[in-house]
Design a protein with these regions (language model features):
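Short hydrophobic/aromatic patches on the structural cores and recognition surfaces of FHA
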Residues: 34, 53-57, 62-67, 71-75, ...
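Short acidic, gly/pro-rich beta-turn/loop elements at beta-sheet edges
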Residues: 28, 44, 67, 76, ...
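Intrinsically disordered, low-complexity acidic Ser/Thr-rich regulatory segments
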Residues: 1-48, 58, 98, 107
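C-terminal boundary/linker segments immediately following FHA domains
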Residues: 70, 76-107
Length: 107
């Protein structure tokens, strides 16, 4: 008979999916980098007006956030430049005219 207590329940991290240029990406790292620098970014946008490391999607305490990494041209949301915003279902962000959408559902 085993008297050891069961291991603690650790809930799975929420799933986040990103849509860009007709492709769907699964965000499965705590910090997903978006930018133009190959080899340093998870999503590479080949545009000279996109910073080398432009923005990050970060998982913090069970919630996802998009964070501007000090880029020159910023991250847009609903016509405004943002530094950081919690991502909610259906959010769309602009990075120098490139639209990036987010969903917690994978159709």
């Amino acid at each position: 008979m085993n008297s050891a207590p069961p291991p603690p329940y650790i809930p799975a991290a929420p799933s986040l999916f990103m849509d860009y240029a007709g492709r769907r990406y699964s965000i499965n790292v705590p910090r997903f980098i978006i930018g133009r620098e190959k080899g340093q970014c998870h999503l590479v946008i080949l545009d000279p007006n996109v910073s080398r490391q432009h923005a990050a999607v970060e998982l913090l305490q069970g919630a996802f956030f998009i964070v501007d990494l000090g880029s020159r041209n910023g991250v847009g949301y609903s016509g405004h430049r943002i530094r950081r915003k919690q991502i909610v279902e259906g959010d769309q962000f602009e990075i120098n005219g490139h639209t990036i959408g987010f969903s917690f559902r994978n159709p």
